[in-house]
A protein has these predicted regions:
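Long, highly charged, low-complexity internal segments
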Residues: 1-12, 18-21, 51, 141-239, ...
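A glycine-rich phosphate-binding loop feature that marks nucleotide/adenosyl-phosphate handling sites
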Residues: 119-120, 140-151, 173-179, 236, ...
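Core structural elements
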Residues: 120-131, 202-214, 232-243, 272-291, ...
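Accessory beta->alpha helical hairpin/"wing" motif in late/C-terminal subdomains of nucleic-acid enzymes
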Residues: 244-266, 414-450
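Substrate/cofactor-recognition hotspot
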Residues: 346-363, 393, 420-423, 427-446, ...
Length: 497
């Protein structure tokens, strides 16, 4: 609601039909979809919370430690009223130590985090709903949606398909583990001369602990887990007190994390903070228990955790090994530099031929190649047609979102899920492909509303939301900009080509 150049959100309780599952906010005792009167209204739970709060007079809210959690805390505070003393407890792991520390350091609700989340929610409603209505009008169905992040992501997937269809010639030399652009010979075998021109020993740092995007990427690549499944498993692990909060873009390691790594690694421990202290920490285990120790404790009833499956343990193992590797001494490597001559070409090939150390054993992120035979000899070659690029995986999409500044750790998975839900994309062998509907929707939006769904404009808006979080700019100024944009979308008459 706009009131004298300011904006006031209007809230209503969420209702859900127990018969058909339809969710709505309209004040009605009848389901708008199926007509059933069997309705679950959140107002009942709100009234129960109010009654409990008034009985005690004091309430501590411990929702998730991010802007969404802060907004939920703020909502609860407003619903309970001023007659109750309300404080916020923030903890990043569900362990007795972390919860005790949170209770000893209660704070007020961070209004800037709340304002930033309000901007995100309202922007999503205004722009997303306005664009979606245009889709409904043109495509004659309400099972479609659009949004600032959703549309560019769909475009990346379409572009990945395009590159996959375009081919280029490549020469493979299997014996040398080499791939050379172009066609270097018409014959199945060529003479090559390999010389060793240098070798050295060195060291490289292990990778940092997981952030949300990196966890999702590796879970898809290594465990073949869809993004949605990974986030659900991580939520379970967090709620079971086994890992820290899993929606984070920070690699920072707390003193508690350092202590856990030191206890597990012993002589292999080096210890790294991986950044400055901030509101969030990396994703890490809360105890110095590897997968097998944890599994043994659960199966022998030493530790009772309900519902832990093999998938939970596999994801835990990935998080544990990555974190412990990040706290190890550097990986020792041996590098060899070769000069390879064939026909009129000369190639220099520098490769890691060995890697050692606990970090490499825990998380082998270093690609090791075999040493090459020296001298002049004949070797086989194979000319193949390779694509200019490959279709994106779910992990690729999330990495792009992180790199391009679109979306946040809490929204990475939901964006991908929505594209599946709307039937804009399908997945084949871990690759994402657009459907005919997805391509039509993307073409319509980019041709008629290019400014509203462009990567650059979306990135700038997200930067402004971050500035609202830091208290640098007014959230109402940002909302005013979005409101003007929304009116432009509403009045535009789209064309269909």
């Amino acid at each position: 609601m706009e009131v004298k150049e300011s904006f006031t959100p209007i809230y209503s309780s969420i209702k859900r039909c127990r018969v058909c599952g339809y969710q709505f906010t309209k004040e009605s005792k009848v389901c708008p979809r199926c007509g059933s009167k069997d309705i679950d209204d959140a107002r009942t739970r709100i009234e129960n919370l109010r009654r409990l709060a008034y009985e005690t007079g004091n309430v501590i809210i411990g929702t998730d430690p991010d802007s969404e959690g802060e907004k939920i805390s703020w909502d609860i505070k407003n619903l309970l009223g001023d007659s109750v003393n309300i404080k916020r407890a923030e903890f990043h792991e569900v362990t007795p130590k972390a919860i005790k520390e949170a209770l000893m350091n209660l704070r007020e609700i961070d209004e800037n985090l709340v304002k930033a989340q309000i901007v995100r929610r309202i922007e999503d409603r205004w722009i997303g709903f306005s664009l979606s209505q245009k889709l409904w009008e043109v495509f004659k169905t309400k099972n479609l949606s659009a949004g600032r992040v959703q549309t560019p992501v769909l475009g990346w997937i379409i572009d990945g398909e395009r590159k996959f269809k375009e081919k280029r010639p490549v020469t493979l030399i299997p014996e040398l583990e080499l791939e050379v652009d172009g066609k270097i010979s018409d014959k199945p075998e060529i003479y090559v001369k390999v010389e060793l021109i240098g070798e050295k020993e060195g060291s490289i740092s292990p990778p940092p602990p997981y952030t949300t995007d990196e966890m999702l990427k590796d879970a898809a690549r290594i465990l073949r887990l869809p993004v949605k499944d990974t986030m659900k498993l991580a939520q379970d692990l967090f709620e079971s007190g086994l890992i820290t909060y899993h929606r984070t873009d920070s690699t920072y390691v707390s003193d508690r994390g350092i202590k856990i790594a030191k206890e597990f690694l012993g002589a292999d421990f080096k210890g790294r903070k991986w950044g400055k202290v901030g509101a969030h920490e990396c994703i890490r285990p809360t105890k110095p228990w590897d997968r097998y120790t944890l599994q043994k404790m659960i199966y022998s009833d030493v530790l009772y955790i309900e519902g832990i499956t093999e998938k939970h343990l596999s994801l835990y193992n990935l998080i544990f090994n990555r974190f412990m590797a990040s706290q190890c001494k550097d990986i020792r490597i041996k590098i060899k530099n070769y000069r390879i001559k064939f026909d009129s070409k000369i190639l220099n090939d520098e490769r890691i031929v060995s890697a050692e150390g606990r970090a490499f054993e825990l998380f082998g992120n270093v690609k090791v190649k075999r040493e090459l035979p020296l001298g002049e000899f004949k070797t086989s070659v194979k000319i193949v047609k390779k694509p200019l690029g490959y279709p994106l995986s779910q992990a690729d999409v999330i990495r792009n979102m992180k790199e391009k500044g679109l979306g946040r750790p809490s929204t990475y998975s939901t964006i991908v899920e929505k594209l599946f839900l709307r039937k804009y994309i399908v997945e084949r062998k871990s690759w994402l492909f657009s459907t005919n509907l997805g391509r039509k929707v993307w073409k319509f939006l980019t041709e008629n509303f290019p400014d509203f769904v462009s990567e650059e404009r979306t990135r700038i808006l997200f930067e402004k939301m971050d500035r609202v979080e830091r208290g640098e700019i007014s959230f109402e100024d940002v909302l005013r900009e979005v409101y003007i944009e929304t009116k432009e979308v509403i009045k535009k008459v789209p064309s269909v080509s």
